[in-house]
Amino acid sequence: ASEGSTGVIVLGSHMTPPRKVSSTGVIVKVIAVAIDNVDRAMVRNVLRDAPSTPFVPGRSFCGRVVDCGLDVKRLRPGDLVFGLQDLRKCGALAEYIMVHQDVVAVAPEGRLVPEQIAALPATGVMVHQIVQNHCMVLPRGSRILVLNAHDMIGRLTMQEASRLGMVTVAQVPPSVPHAEALCRQNGAVEVLMGDPLWTINLLHESSFNL
């Protein structure tokens, strides 16, 4: 536990795997879990509050379906899936997790390893919200600036913006190796090497729609 925390982080095996599944539930044997800043913040908060019951963190995961409820039609045992557990529940850092069918989907196989697949849900949901709320209201050909385009959120945003016909300008720090090639592979038309603040100061805000 960190300084100032009253709880303790442990790796244990005292929790039994789920045996019964609800009609709309899915039991997944977890292969990989992606931890982001949201998960870290939740763990810090839980430790500070000294929980009376164990808290299992982890939201974004990849695994294989073990069992499905009677009303689950699009998944079956053996499917490789990825998903994002509800923030109020978490629990992915376990051998098994039971989730509602709506928070999992069949994962892409062949091009990504489970660790990479596990990172997609948390990032993908955020990018989906960005695209739905901002990009999709713009006409094709609109210019958008993506800051820190080399990270996962930036890459997915460039891919989706390019698919919608946006003209994407990417900013990446000079320290990122092969940055220009990486951004162009993900849909960038122009790549600017520099810090985010430098890039914003360099460009006039009227040059972009977003």
List PLM regions with ranges.
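NAD(P)H dinucleotide-binding glycine-rich loop of Rossmann-like/cofactor-binding domains
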Residues: 82-148
